[in-house]
């Protein structure tokens, strides 16, 4: 037993051990002590001593727990010990084993185990010293090469790891004093291998080695291990002259046990050849190596320098020192770190010691990236032998660039990383240009225009910015005047103008509303004068306190008192008085509490009074009954509760004790029922006579005879001669206990005395009296009581007798000394205690045990066990209590369990009844009680509000019963169109017309006429001009007077600042302007020249220049100007520019034009005039919105949405006396024709004009063209200008139009969405925006079977976001769809369930808006779901369900796969799935069709609709067969097939013997050679008969028993014959199985029904080819026929049978002519599936099949010659199926099915998709494809007829370059994906129709 217990203890200890971390918590020091003759402090030289601090906490560390210290780059431990203990105060708290890394791992480690200690501790800590040496290389092994890079000479950080705890210290390492240019030798002992590792590195050749010889030869006694040789070349050495890499090179080696020689050649410069090997040197004190050192450098130097070195050998005194073999093996384990262990080894038996390197499962880390801010990790574990994978998804940011000007002289770029988003900001600051005066004007265009007027050097440039009118915000204020006042504040462009209207005070009505935001909002609606202003204050909802009062009326009244914000609202509900139930509870507080719970009308109010617990007086009475009775009288609070317990009389046990008083005391203790009462009699102490004897035993004996009170007690002590030490302890009992521990002779006996309160020391003395005396000295508390016992010397023999008296008598007979005294004790008879026990027997047993006097006799009654009744109650404590009441035999035991009250969750539901219902579900303890309240539906009020978000939100607020539900719809604010009118009043009026959501609000502003401000400007003309600009209301009209420029006088001054300043003083017209230039002294050199102009000019020496636009202006107003001002319009162009002194490149990136038709005009007018510095370029383009799809090149796809024309022009002016003009214009109109006109003219100074024009047209290619582009390039060369040498503009527009194809069958989709692109400039700035798509989808599917007709689903998709990433895998076919509403068809037809959210990757569904269930009547139930559901999905599922109804077969057809891995949180149900399809890398589609017909399976579905309520839906399905079909797999796909499991089916596989036969024959003739190969394969099975039976409950009265038996083996024969003349393959086979089903009532006495099914499946396949010359016709025909015969017998003696027959035939014929192969295929398929309902009696079917234009011969099929061609064939199949069914009510039902199929096929790829649609991907030869669809009609006579409707799908493709890539996207892998043209066909349709 003890070994088993120890084994169990060991098992429990091992099984509960855990891994802890953080024990090693400090790296106190790392010091070096020189060993042997090492002369420098290198990391590899012994000995380094590491002092580490450790700490163990008893609360977290248990015996057997383990922890590990990882010591990177540590080679070994310099000690003969194998372990070290972690000790503190002499106690070993843990033992750590040394695991040296040596040549096996790149680190060493300590594997520690917590020891079991006998001392109690909270925390133990200390330090441990470890003598170590580091690994910095030494061989070419992978471990040494890795560790060779651990350290460098100088200061290093050494870090060890204990779990996540890292401890570090710094240390200085000396470099090797040996020169690295000479030869390098090294030898290092590996203790675990008992070998030395020797290294040789050839001396350095700086230019490389031509050839060389290296190696070494051992002396006698030392051997070389040729299996461990490393040869390589290292690119350099580390600071200790060890290789850091090992690369392959050309060499030959010769190795034996006595030497290794390597001959090498052609070593590149910078590399050093090396060789290392293991050397065994046991039992010798030293060994000598002779080194071969011969080499020729590439510079021609040849060195031959062999040498010899003596190494001291390694003497190992371990058990394996006698030459045992050590083998190193590698083993993969499931641990997380690498460890080294030595397997058990007995040197007397074993000859091989094995060192195992335990390596963890290798892990491959794959790093991916995405645009984001956080890094995620996903680990895919692997078993041993596999490789685990860790996918690290790292974020990267994209940038947006903001360019600003600053006062510095250089361009700076600063990147600001966004810590919370994925878009960083790059701020580019460029030097500010010359001083510029900016004039901002408003104009009527919708885009901005900037015109820069550049004055001569040292002047002030002007920038005229024309901005669209700012929106105006009108603010109305009230003042104390009686009239109105209007003030207009005009802000800069892109701002908002303000109009402040001061009106006399209107009365104001303030309305306060509450909303769901956490902040307050105030909106003021100001009406015109004499109106009433409104202030709408939106505040966060106040908390509401509802007070319910009762009044005398018979109806209810509710009064709501809404307080101001930040207050508390009150709802006063006055209700008719409800009846009140008062419940009084007790609680643990010392005060009373009263809680009133007022329920809704017609309810019952509750008053819960919590009172301090009343004291309870329990009175127990005994009565004559044999059972117990308890009566509890609970008094009101502040009273005393009474518990009257009536029990059968308990037996009484009387115990007599002694105490220190001089009188007697009797105490009666009455125990609970079924217990034993106690009577404690306390008597004065009797005198005690103690007789001590010595005997020959080695232990002591004490016998105590206690007499009744007034008697004399006797103690007979038999002791060995040992002394006794008495130890006194305290315990909780009220009496003393003495335990004597007798030790062997020569020991010390111990007496352990347990005393109440004070300890007692008992001293026994001998005296001369003849009687015993006991004296007790009682000391105060915390003292020690003394008992002095004086005993006579003689021993006493006591004899006890029983007598009839009721008291005890003691007679002592004292004999002379050396005699024996006698004590005769007479005792009254002992009381008897009867104990009743239960045992497993069925009868009763009584046993009587008689004890000595003053004892208690026992009667043990054993009874059969009583039954037990368990009662569970709730109480107010927070813990559970269990009380067991055991009654006498033949009674019933009670177990009373008191549990804390369960929490209660109240769920309110609405139902269709007009009254309320409350159901309370009380769960067992530790559960949650539920109260389900069902209320009539509340009326709903819908309120629509506007909010600041860009999307719509619907919030439903469901109020308690008898309330009103609210639906709050939050819509984005409507766009507002503001119309301003003038009127004759002196005040402003604003009228706001607010329309419903998705509309446009109107603001009509009526304003008084504006004042006028006159502004005078200068311009380059010689005459004056006046322009009147009329601004919107509340603005100021402007009159702009343009005057010729005043002459300017320029004054240049020097000042002490480091920057230049230019001040322009502009005088009124006809005056003289002044320019004052203040320049710093350096570094400006000013050269003054005279010229013919009337003004001064300063030209700075500019080394760099950069500007976003170029400008020009007239130098003088007197110069000759072209009278036409057509080209003077100021237009801006956005450019990104860079300059240097030699060239200038300007790259213009035009945004995408979002217009319908436009004209693009570019004009270049280069007039040249003196001075040469007046050069200007004016460019403009309109502004427009654009968004982007990623493009790999700077191109744009133009989208069109309206008919307005926007000109774009670029004009360059060069003023000179000789004029020349060049104009080029490109215009595109809605006719899609491009026109390009080029013209130029020379205009001499004499004003004569010679013009030459040419016109070029560029026509748009046909609509099927894949791509064309038009580029416009203009170029201007600077005129003798050193800082503007050359500027080049290039812009391009690419328009992509591709063909499309449409189908009228299957699926029709119309996508309306905006596609826009973004131009990516050289700074890789990327802007990604999303578009909104509205997709109405209508699908129609016909299966051709009467059980399924049509499904139509119309979904309104309100939000589709198409995402295109910059990098990574791109799938343009995916989208994230959120369906906000769905419309389902009416009852009686199949309901299609559209998923509420679809994603292509992992997605989370929270609070799904709806969940649809289909009942047996095919109705739709919508249940709101408030659970959180997480699903990993690769595809979406659209279940098509039609459940069982009378007279029809039930079938469930999912048309697509269902995702796996779904998890539902919040309900006990789980989601099981059956199929998964994964599509990667392409827009292909994988369709999996699973048709399931199961046998009487019960499917239960759980839906959580708002915790904790639970909705259960049970669907009963009937199925007889399972068929799985997978079709249409296009592109790269991964699919997991469905595995169908049914509990009622037996599992088994066909097994048997396969016998192959093959014969080959060849015959030669003059006509040629004929070869024949005959292959035959036979499969014969021997399947034993096996039967499976499944019994499950059917109804409340019957149960279903299903028995399936398979007993007929399956046989199959395959044969093939191949020859050069013909080939033939045949295959036959058949199988048969039977299924027996029966239903039996639960009492197994009534036979209900039985069904026998027999299934026979014969299959025949024949294939024959013939090869006549020159053409070969090949035909193939395969067929499969399945028959199912089902019969059913019921008690009513009715017979029910079903016959199922299906035929499938396919024929293939080919024609081969020369090397041209054309294919044609003929497909014939007829399927009939006919079943009936449970009530059907008879059934019959007739199938007719005809193939027009073809014969039905299997071996020689023919095709209608009029329809066959080289490109394919066409044929037709007409099938007619007629059925009739007779029901019990003699109602006849007949149906017929007619199907017609016609196919035309090219030798190209055919891809089939769901719903019968097909896609044919042809080359460039063009084709047509037609398919048929079935429509169904139902007549009133219960007949179903299917007729064929022809639908033609045609495609015409004309392209001159079919291989042109239409669009490119970047998938992150560097490849370009070519997308099929159908997608861009949709894009083209979009362009053509918007």
Swiss-Prot record:
Changing residue 1859 to N: In allele ALS9-2. Changing residue 1308 to N: In allele ALS9-2. Keywords: Cell adhesion, Cell membrane, Cell wall, Disulfide bond, Glycoprotein, GPI-anchor, Lipoprotein, Membrane, Repeat, Secreted, Signal, Virulence. InterPro entries: Adhesion_dom_sf, Agglutinin-like_ALS_rpt, Agglutinin-like_N, Agglutinin-like_N_N2, ALS, Fibrogen-bd_dom1. Changing residue 298 to E: In allele ALS9-2. Glycans are attached at residues 57, 1175, 1475, 1818, 1821. The lineage of its organism: Eukaryota, Fungi, Dikarya, Ascomycota, Saccharomycotina. Changing residue 1429 to L: In allele ALS9-2. It comes from Candida albicans (strain SC5314 / ATCC MYA-2876). This is Agglutinin-like protein 9. Changing residue 250 to S: In allele ALS9-2. Each ALS protein has a similar three-domain structure, including a N-ter domain of 433-436 amino acids that is 55-90 percent identical across the family and which mediates adherence to various materials; a central domain of variable numbers of tandemly repeated copies of a 36 amino acid motif; and a C-ter; domain that is relatively variable in length and sequence across the family.
């Amino acid at each position: 037993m003890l070994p088993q217990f120890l084994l169990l203890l060991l098992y429990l200890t091992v099984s509960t051990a855990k891994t802890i971390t953080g024990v090693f918590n400090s790296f106190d020091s790392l010091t070096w002590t020189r060993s042997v003759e090492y002369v420098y402090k290198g990391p590899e030289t012994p000995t380094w001593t590491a002092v580490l601090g450790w700490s163990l906490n008893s609360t977290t560390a248990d015996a057997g727990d383990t922890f590990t210290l990882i010591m990177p780059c540590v080679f070994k431990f310099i000690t003969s010990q194998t372990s070290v203990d972690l000790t503190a105060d002499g106690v070993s708290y843990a033992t750590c084993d040394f695991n040296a890394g040596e040549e096996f791992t790149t680190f060493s480690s300590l594997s520690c185990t917590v020891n079991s200690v006998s001392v109690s501790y909270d925390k133990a800590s200390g330090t441990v010293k470890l003598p170590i040496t580091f690994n910095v290389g030494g061989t070419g092994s992978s471990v040494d090469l890795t560790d060779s890079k651990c350290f460098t000479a100088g200061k290093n950080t050494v870090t060890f790891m204990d779990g996540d705890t890292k401890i570090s210290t710094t240390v200085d390492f000396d470099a090797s004093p040996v020169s690295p240019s000479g030869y390098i030798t090294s030898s290092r002992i590996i203790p675990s291998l008992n070998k030395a590792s020797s290294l040789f590195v050839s001396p350095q050749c700086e230019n490389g080695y031509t050839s060389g010889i290296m190696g070494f030869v051992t002396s006698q006694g030392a051997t070389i291990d040729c299996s461990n040789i490393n040869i390589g070349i290292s690119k350099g050495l580390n600071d200790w002259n060890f290789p850091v890499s090992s690369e392959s090179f050309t060499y030959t080696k010769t190795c034996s046990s006595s030497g290794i020689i390597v001959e090498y050649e052609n070593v590149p410069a910078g590399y050093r050849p090396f060789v290392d090997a293991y050397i065994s040197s046991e039992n010798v004190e030293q060994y000598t190596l002779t080194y071969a050192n011969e080499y020729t450098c590439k510079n021609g130097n040849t060195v031959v320098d062999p040498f010899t070195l003596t190494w001291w050998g390694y003497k190992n005194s371990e058990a394996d020192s006698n030459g045992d073999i050590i083998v190193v093996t590698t083993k993969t384990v499931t641990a997380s770190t690498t460890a080294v262990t030595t397997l058990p080894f007995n040197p007397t038996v074993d000859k091989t010691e094995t060192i195992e390197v335990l390596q963890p499962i290798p892990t491959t880390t794959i790093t991916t990236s995405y645009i984001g801010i956080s890094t995620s990790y996903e680990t895919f574990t692997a078993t041993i032998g596999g490789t685990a994978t860790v996918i690290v998804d790292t974020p990267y940011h994209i940038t947006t660039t903001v360019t600003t000007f600053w006062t510095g002289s250089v361009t700076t770029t600063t990147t600001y990383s966004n810590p919370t988003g994925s878009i960083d900001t790059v701020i580019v600051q460029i030097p500010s240009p010359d001083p510029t005066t900016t004039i901002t004007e408003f104009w009527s265009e919708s885009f901005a225009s900037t015109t820069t007027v550049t004055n001569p050097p040292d002047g002030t440039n002007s920038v005229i910015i024309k901005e669209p009118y700012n929106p105006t915000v009108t603010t109305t204020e009230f003042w104390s005047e009686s009239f109105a006042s209007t003030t207009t504040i005009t802000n800069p462009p892109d701002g908002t103008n303000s109009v402040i209207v001061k009106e006399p005070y209107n009365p104001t009505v303030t309305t306060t509303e509450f909303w769901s935001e956490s902040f307050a909002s105030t909106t003021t609606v100001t009406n015109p004068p004499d109106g009433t202003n409104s202030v709408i204050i939106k505040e966060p909802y106040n908390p509401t306190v509802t007070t319910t009062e009762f009044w005398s009326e018979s109806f209810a009244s509710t009064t709501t008192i809404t307080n101001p914000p930040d207050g508390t609202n009150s709802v006063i509900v006055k209700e008719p008085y409800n009846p009140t139930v008062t419940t009084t509870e007790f609680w643990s507080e010392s005060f009373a509490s009263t809680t009133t719970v007022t329920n809704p009308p017609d309810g019952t109010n509750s008053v819960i009074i919590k009172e301090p617990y009343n004291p309870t007086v329990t009175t127990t009475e005994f009565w004559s009954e044999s059972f117990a009775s308890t009566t509890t009288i609970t008094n009101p609070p502040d009273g005393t509760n009474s518990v009257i317990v009536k029990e059968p009389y308990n037996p009484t046990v009387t115990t007599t004790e002694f105490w220190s008083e001089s009188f007697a005391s009797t105490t009666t203790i009455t125990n609970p029922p079924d217990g034993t009462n106690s009577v404690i009699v306390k008597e004065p102490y009797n005198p005690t006579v103690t007789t001590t004897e010595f005997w020959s035993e080695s232990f002591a004996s004490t016998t105590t005879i206690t007499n009744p009170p007034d008697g004399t007690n006797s103690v007979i002590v038999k002791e060995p001669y040992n002394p006794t030490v008495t130890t006194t302890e305290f315990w909780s009992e009220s009496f003393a206990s003495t335990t004597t521990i007798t030790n062997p002779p020569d020991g010390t006996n111990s007496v352990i005395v347990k005393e109440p309160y004070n300890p007692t020391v008992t001293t026994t003395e001998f005296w001369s009296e003849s009687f015993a005396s006991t004296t007790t000295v009682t000391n105060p508390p915390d003292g020690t009581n003394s008992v002095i016992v004086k005993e006579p010397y003689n021993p006493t023999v006591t004899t006890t007798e029983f007598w009839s008296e009721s008291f005890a008598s003691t007679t002592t007979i004292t004999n002379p000394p050396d005699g024996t005294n006698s004590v005769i004790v007479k005792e009254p008879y002992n009381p008897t205690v009867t104990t009743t026990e239960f045992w497993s027997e069925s009868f009763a047993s009584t046993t009587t045990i008689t004890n000595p006097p003053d004892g208690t006799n026992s009667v043990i009654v054993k009874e059969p066990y009583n039954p037990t009744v368990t009662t569970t109650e709730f109480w107010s404590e927070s813990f559970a209590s269990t009380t067991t009441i055991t009654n006498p035999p033949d009674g019933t035991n009670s177990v009373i369990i008191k549990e804390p009250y369960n929490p209660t969750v109240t769920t309110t539901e609405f139902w269709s009844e007009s009254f309320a219902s409350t159901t309370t579900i009380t769960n067992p303890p530790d559960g949650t009680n539920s109260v389900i309240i069902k209320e009539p539906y509340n009326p709903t009020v819908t309120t629509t509000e506007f909010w600041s978000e860009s999307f719509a939100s619907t919030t439903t607020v469901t109020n308690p019963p008898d309330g009103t539900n609210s639906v709050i719809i939050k819509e984005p604010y409507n766009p507002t169109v503001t119309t301003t009118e003038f009127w004759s009043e002196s005040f402003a009026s604003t009228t706001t017309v607010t329309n419903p959501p998705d509309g446009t609000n109107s603001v009509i502003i009526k304003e008084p006429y504006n004042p006028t401000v006159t502004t005078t400007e200068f311009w380059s003309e010689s005459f004056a001009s006046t322009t009147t600009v009329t601004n919107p209301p509340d603005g100021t009209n402007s009159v702009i007077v343009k005057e010729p420029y005043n002459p300017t006088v320029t004054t240049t001054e020097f000042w002490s600042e480091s920057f230049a300043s230019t001040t322009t003083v502009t005088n009124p017209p006809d005056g003289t302007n002044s320019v004052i230039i203040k320049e710093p002294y350096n570094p400006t050199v000013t050269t003054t020249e005279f010229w013919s102009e009337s003004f001064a000019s300063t030209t700075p020496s500019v080394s760099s220049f950069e500007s976003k636009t170029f400008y020009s202006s007239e130098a003088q107003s007197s110069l000759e100007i072209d009278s036409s001002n057509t080209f003077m319009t100021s237009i801006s162009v956005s450019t990104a520019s860079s300059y240097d002194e030699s060239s200038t490149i300007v790259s213009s990136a035009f945004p995408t034009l979002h217009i319908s038709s436009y004209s693009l005009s570019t004009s270049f007018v280069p007039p040249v005039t003196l001075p040469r510095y007046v050069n200007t370029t004016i460019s403009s383009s309109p502004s427009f919105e654009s968004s982007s799809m990623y493009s790999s090149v700077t191109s744009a796809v133009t989208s069109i949405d309206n008919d307005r024309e926007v000109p774009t022009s670029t004009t360059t002016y060069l003023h000179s006396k000789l004029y020349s003009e060049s104009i080029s214009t490109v215009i595109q109109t809605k006719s899609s024709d491009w026109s390009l006109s080029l013209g130029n003219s020379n205009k001499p100074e004499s004003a004569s004009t010679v013009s030459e024009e040419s016109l070029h047209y560029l026509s748009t290619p046909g609509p099927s063209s894949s791509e064309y582009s038009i580029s416009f390039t203009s170029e201007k060369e600077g005129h003798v200008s050193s800082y503007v040498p050359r500027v080049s503009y290039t812009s391009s527009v690419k328009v992509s139009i591709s063909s499309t194809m449409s189908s009228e069958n299957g699926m029709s989709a119309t996508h309306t969405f905006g596609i826009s692109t973004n131009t990516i400039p050289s700074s890789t700035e990327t802007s990604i925006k999303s578009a909104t798509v509205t997709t109405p989808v209508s699908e129609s599917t016909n299966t051709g079977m009467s059980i399924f007709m049509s499904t139509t689903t119309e979904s309104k998709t309100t939000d589709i976001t198409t995402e295109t990433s910059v990098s990574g895998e791109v799938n343009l076919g995916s989208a994230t769809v959120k369906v906000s509403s769905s419309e389902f068809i009416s009852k009686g037809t199949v309901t299609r369930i559209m998923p509420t959210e679809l994603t292509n990757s992992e997605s989370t569904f929270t609070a799904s808006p709806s969940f649809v269930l289909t009942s047996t009547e095919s109705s739709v139930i919508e249940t709101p779901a408030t659970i959180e559901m997480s699903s990993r999905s690769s595809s979406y599922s659209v279940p098509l369900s039609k459940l069982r109804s009378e007279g029809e077969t039930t079938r469930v057809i999912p048309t697509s796969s269902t995702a796996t891995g779904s998890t539902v949180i919040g309900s006990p149900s789980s989601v099981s799935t059956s199929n998964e399809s994964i599509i990667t890398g392409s827009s292909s589609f994988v369709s999996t069709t699973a048709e399931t017909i199961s046998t009487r399976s019960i499917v239960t579905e759980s839906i959580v609709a708002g915790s904790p309520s639970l909705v259960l839906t049970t669907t009963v399905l009937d199925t007889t067969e399972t068929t799985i079909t997978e079709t249409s797999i296009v592109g790269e796909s991964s699919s997991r097939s469905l595995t169908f499991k049914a509990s009622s089916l037996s599992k088994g596989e066909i097994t048997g013997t396969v016998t192959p036969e093959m014969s080959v024959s060849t015959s030669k003739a003059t006509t040629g050679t004929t070869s024949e190969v005959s292959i035959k394969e036979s499969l014969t099975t021997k399947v034993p008969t096996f039967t499976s039976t499944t019994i499950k409950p059917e109804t409340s009265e019957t149960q279903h028993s299903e028995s399936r038996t398979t007993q007929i083996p399956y046989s199959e024969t395959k044969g093939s014959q191949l020859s050069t003349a013909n080939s033939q393959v045949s295959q036959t086979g058949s199988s048969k199985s039977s299924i027996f089903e029966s239903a039996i009532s639960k009492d197994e006495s009534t036979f209900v029904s039985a069904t026998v099914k027999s299934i026979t499946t014969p299959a025949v396949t024949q294939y024959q080819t013939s090869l006549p010359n020159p053409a070969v016709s090949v035909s193939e025909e395969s067929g499969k026929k399945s028959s199912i015969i089902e019969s059913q017998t019921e008690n009513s003696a009715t017979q029910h049978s079903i016959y199922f027959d299906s035929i499938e035939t396919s024929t293939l014929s080919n024609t081969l002519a020369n090397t041209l192969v054309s294919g044609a295929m003929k497909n014939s398929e007829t399927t009939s599936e006919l079943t009936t309902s449970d009530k059907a009696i008879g059934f019959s079917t007739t199938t007719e099949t005809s193939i027009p234009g073809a014969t039905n011969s299997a071996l020689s099929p023919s095709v209608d010659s009029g329809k066959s061609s080289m490109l394919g064939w066409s044929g037709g199949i007409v099938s007619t199926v007629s059925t009739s069914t007779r029901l019990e009510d003699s109602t006849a039902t007949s149906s017929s099915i007619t199907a017609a199929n016609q196919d035309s096929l090219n030798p190209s790829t055919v891809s089939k998709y769901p719903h019968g649609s097909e896609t044919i991907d042809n080359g460039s030869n063009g084709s047509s494809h037609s398919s048929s669809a079935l429509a169904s009609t139902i007549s009133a006579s219960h007949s179903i007829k299917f007729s064929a409707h022809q639908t033609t799908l045609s495609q015409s493709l004309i392209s001159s370059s079919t291989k042109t890539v239409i669009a490119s996207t970047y998938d992150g892998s560097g490849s370009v994906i070519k997308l099929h043209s159908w997608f861009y066909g949709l894009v083209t349709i979009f362009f053509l129709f918007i």
